[in-house]
Amino acid sequence: MKITLPDFTRAGVLVVGDVMLDRYWYGPTNRISPEAPVPVVKVDSVEERPGGAANVAMNIASLGAKSRLVGLTGVDDAARALSAALSGVNVQCDFVSVATHPTITKLRVLSRNQQLIRLDFEEGFDGVDPEPMLERIQRSLPGIGALVLSDYAKGALATVETMIALARKAGVPVLVDPKGTDFSRYHGATLLTPNLSEFEAVVGKCKSEADIVERGTALMQQHALSALLVTRSEHGMTLLQPGKAPFHMPTQAQEVFDVTGAGDTVIGVLATALAAGNTLEESCFLANAAAGVVVGKLGTSTVSPMELENAIHARPESGFGVMSEAQLIVEVKKARQRGEKVVMTNGVFDILHAGHVSYLANARKLGDRLIVAVNSDASTRRLKGETRPVNPLLNRMMVLGALEAVDWVIGFEEDTPQRAIAEILPDLLVKGGDYKPEDIAGSKEVWANGGDVQVLNFEDGISTSNIIKTIISGSGKN
């Protein structure tokens, strides 16, 4: 499917559901406890992230959309940490505080990128007065493009039938990430997004795609659903709609590090794209691409427009071309296993010219694989002025990816690619011009990893700025 990203800033999405705080304790394990046969983790860092429905809201905000969140919390430090983290990423919180219950908290202990144990601090919110939640939903419905109901069976969606009815009456599509086996609670929803295990718990074991289609179609009819999206892990996703052919999407994940919160990303991106004006099929395609990015990260994570742009134009099946940073890290790992030397460079590459081509060819000769990191449009404007870039990011990346010398192309939002370089850690970092190696962004990280940094010369007299001046002069403009 050919698709371009919509203007997510036009979208407004309301998320209602079970909010929670995800806590992560990280540290090395070098010995077994003398008290019991368990590893001892020496905790050296702690992290807190919004989880559950709050992670859905963060995924929406990370795309630049207007994200509003309604949920239940306690009156405690976890609630304050949750509110602070969400407000910091432009999620508008409208929580109902319940003094008699603690905020749901999940504590995960990790060592060497492996989760050792999870501890849950919760009582659930069953029996809490639903009226404050319903009032907040009613107040928020005008002006939003989609309602997401994120159900973790903790009590926030005790009156989910009423919530769906309110939204449908207001003409707002309702997307539900379900929980449990009683899907009758979601009667009349626009879309349900169960994973395969949740789906089979309701309809029985499916031995083939034909079973999924047949039983999914019956489920839609039974509960008056407008659509059903079954997420199927390594088998991708299947979208079912009454009267339409099934829409199967293969997975875009290159390597899975952590599936925590992947379902939150799917429904968050899907709802945002739908609210921004995409069709349901297009929205599912974008959600599938986003899931492929986020499972390559550790812990509950979000996806940025840049990562999504890279992912939907990637060629993961070939292992080369334009791709996301997460996909690139996987490919670089494979290249090193093959004994290949990885070279990396960066730039704006606005109007590609002979000087660029010569420089990139020379950089490629210094190793076996060449990565080109490209400034985003916003980054280019900050560096070059409001009239630049002439060519948008996707066009620049696609042209670079077509060059014989270039193996991989990624985009980055920052003014420099230092963060990306620190993540990728090439064997050789190359920069064109009259830089000193120690002044090149990312040089310290590459040296610390045992790599090298080298400066190459550009061809004299050839530059994008000069080309633009020549074009303007030739057109008779001053």
Curated annotation (Swiss-Prot):
Species: Erwinia tasmaniensis (strain DSM 17950 / CFBP 7177 / CIP 109463 / NCPPB 4357 / Et1/99)
Task: List cellular component terms (GO).
Answer: cytosol
Q: Gene that codes for this?
A: hldE
Question: Taxonomic lineage per UniProt?
Answer: Bacteria, Pseudomonadati, Pseudomonadota, Gammaproteobacteria, Enterobacterales
Q: Which keywords label this protein? A: ATP-binding, Carbohydrate metabolism, Kinase, Multifunctional enzyme, Nucleotide-binding, Nucleotidyltransferase, Transferase
Which pathway features in its UniProt record?
Nucleotide-sugar biosynthesis; ADP-L-glycero-beta-D-manno-heptose biosynthesis; ADP-L-glycero-beta-D-manno-heptose from D-glycero-beta-D-manno-heptose 7-phosphate: step 1/4; Nucleotide-sugar biosynthesis; ADP-L-glycero-beta-D-manno-heptose biosynthesis; ADP-L-glycero-beta-D-manno-heptose from D-glycero-beta-D-manno-heptose 7-phosphate: step 3/4
Reaction(s) catalysed by this chain, per the record, are: D-glycero-beta-D-manno-heptose 7-phosphate + ATP = D-glycero-beta-D-manno-heptose 1,7-bisphosphate + ADP + H(+); D-glycero-beta-D-manno-heptose 1-phosphate + ATP + H(+) = ADP-D-glycero-beta-D-manno-heptose + diphosphate
| Keyword Kinase listed | yes
Under Enzyme Commission nomenclature, its number is 2.7.1.167, 2.7.7.70
Region described as Ribokinase:
1-318
Q: Provide the residue positions that the database annotates as binding ATP.
A: N195, L196, S197, E198
> InterPro entries per the record?
Bifunc_HldE, Carboh/pur_kinase_PfkB_CS, Cyt_trans-like, PfkB_dom, RfaE_dom_I, RfaE_dom_II, Ribokinase-like, Rossmann-like_a/b/a_fold
**Protein name, as recorded:** Bifunctional protein HldE
